[in-house]
UniProtKB/Swiss-Prot annotation:
NCBIfam families, per database record: PPR
UniProt similarity note: Belongs to the PPR family. P subfamily.
Main location per the UniProt record: mitochondrion
UniProtKB keywords: Mitochondrion, Repeat, Transit peptide
Protein name: Pentatricopeptide repeat-containing protein At2g26790, mitochondrial
Intracellular or extracellular location(s): Mitochondrion
Domain of life: Eukaryota
Keyword Transcription regulation: no
GO CC annotations, alphabetized: mitochondrion
Organism classification: Eukaryota, Viridiplantae, Streptophyta, Embryophyta, Tracheophyta
Transit peptide stretch: 1-27
InterPro entries for the chain: Pentatricopeptide_rpt, TPR-like_helical_dom_sf
Amino acid sequence: MRFSPTFFLLSQLRLTRRRAATSSRFYAVSALNNPNNLSDSEQQQVNHLNLSKLTQHGLQRLLNSTRDDPNLALSFLRQLKEHGVSPNVNAYATLVRILTTWGLDIKLDSVLVELIKNEERGFTVMDLIEVIGEQAEEKKRSFVLIRVSGALVKAYVSLGMFDEATDVLFQSKRLDCVVDIKACNFLMNRMTEFGKIGMLMTLFKQLKQLGLCANEYTYAIVVKALCRKGNLEEAAMLLIENESVFGYKTFINGLCVTGETEKAVALILELIDRKYLAGDDLRAVLGMVVRGFCNEMKMKAAESVIIEMEEIGFGLDVYACLAVIDRYCKNMNLPEALGFLDKMLGKGLKVNCVIVSLILQCYCKMDMCLEALEKFKEFRDMNIFLDRVCYNVAFDALSKLGRVEEAFELLQEMKDRGIVPDVINYTTLIDGYCLQGKVVDALDLIDEMIGNGMSPDLITYNVLVSGLARNGHEEEVLEIYERMKAEGPKPNAVTNSVIIEGLCFARKVKEAEDFFSSLEQKCPENKASFVKGYCEAGLSKKAYKAFVRLEYPLRKSVYIKLFFSLCIEGYLEKAHDVLKKMSAYRVEPGRSMCGKMIGAFCKLNNVREAQVLFDTMVERGLIPDLFTYTIMIHTYCRLNELQKAESLFEDMKQRGIKPDVVTYTVLLDRYLKLDPEHHETCSVQGEVGKRKASEVLREFSAAGIGLDVVCYTVLIDRQCKMNNLEQAAELFDRMIDSGLEPDMVAYTTLISSYFRKGYIDMAVTLVTELSKKYNIPSESFEAAVKSAALKAKRFQYGE
């Protein structure tokens, strides 16, 4: 009996499946995909198929016979390509038709993406669609073409080929096939995400020509696109013509995202009156409003919406609360974040690990690592589930505090709680050990990772070689570097940079330069690393020279390092040049850099440049911090420009930045010096100063801020100059009773007044007390005391 070659091939494929040792239905598929899964006899049978000699006609018959087993068809086609056989358009059409009929969308998408990428396929994608239409049964033709066309649209979109995806819609119409509106919506939505608004609007206007009927989701996508483009009026008109709850929700979100949250609130109120919004839809849009107000820095408005949501029966929305806390933390306004959290906890908010991690990270970013640890323990004691992200913040805080051994103990605690450490957790601890110079312990952790079946990634190795380099272990660095090149993960530009910076930090500048010279590929990033490296080595002038030669944008961290190094060494003009270059390359300097530069300008009384930089910060959306506001206010007070100082004081309060004792003291000191008793000004100005000083003191007291030594000294000085020595002494005693230690300035302010008024005994008592407190020999004061006493007596008796 004779058998056709096609029958023989098919029987061999099925025979392989029947002989499988497992009962899994798809064993043959996995075996064909991975020949290593086959036994020797099975592999021999597959090799005997002679796929390379199979004709296109035979291939077609074989594929048709697998229509009841799409996985087998897919595997067979892959085997063909592995044997160098290029399936023609008919073979692909058959496979696509089979996958479509079975509804295997993910596999279909994969095949089509692979097909689109293959530029040597020998046919166009539209040829494929036409053949599929010809092959399909008449009653299934429309169904198959719609599914395939929709899948093609998605495949092109996934590759960012929007023109080709749009072309599929028109070509399908030519074949009397109208693509499902869902595929068109998918295309339009991705156009929006990629900013291709013009292309989207053109397609939207041609929907009727394509035979497509837009649904509410189509209109919502167009509304979203128009909002992103800033065409709010056009979006509103489109929405009025095609009202839907989904469309309104999209429009409201667009208003909130574009800084028009107040308009969004007005629209929501109107829709509530029309009974158009209620339930979950209302809750969703109110959440959008909260996020919108947060983005616009209208934090109290955001908080009021959350309270409103609770009062109308929605309860506390954890995601809305999260948005408020997140914004406070991003602005480094930790007191407000904690205050809001406490209020919400009082109302029954269930805190999750995301909120905890935001709070802890904010502490660390503000260099309050000790406080972060205390808060971590507090949250842990509240039985809040803390994930590995929260633990990692604690690891990082302990490492920065030099308590890496405690971090390791915390790792054991995390394991005991059933939380499996990940690569990031180990990397943080490795970094902590390196910071303390305990490189052996860091290497032990690498071994532990590998022993637990965890592969250190490139970031882990970068942290390790950086730590070794910073501790001067040049040979070990180069050994690991060579191993990475040989075994992986391959070193990248970051690896090279951290080695250069690390060696410079260890004062091995020559070795760093030699390492750079040895690199086969030198990138701009590595050259920029020398700017940071020279700064680490205390060579800021050399770093600046290297910086000037680099005529391209650098990492922000490079600018920051150079800027602060120049400031520390007093090269303020060069530091200002760094800021200017950042601005030229549109690199945002950040609040700390601008604040530092403003402080430097203020110390030089160059308040004009300070104000220009201050205004630039605000224009860029960078809210100056308390330090920056205070030093600007102090400078204006020192230059007797009180109106500008007062304007800044009010501005900081409006932005939600609470003045501290230093800010209040700066203003109080200036106002008190306007008092006519100080003999600095006329009586009218003096009365104004007296009134404003009283206002500051009242506000100071209402804020619940305790006086510090400087503030007490200012008040003591005022009483002394008004000859109210008894009240000055009372203030001095009150300062001590409050637990504060008077400093040298506070003592000398009162002592000099006692001498001036002839209260020699009281002055000598304070001098003796001061001598004992600062452990200064009394002989050092004796001459000064006698001289002061003699002058006082002569003054007293008119000599």
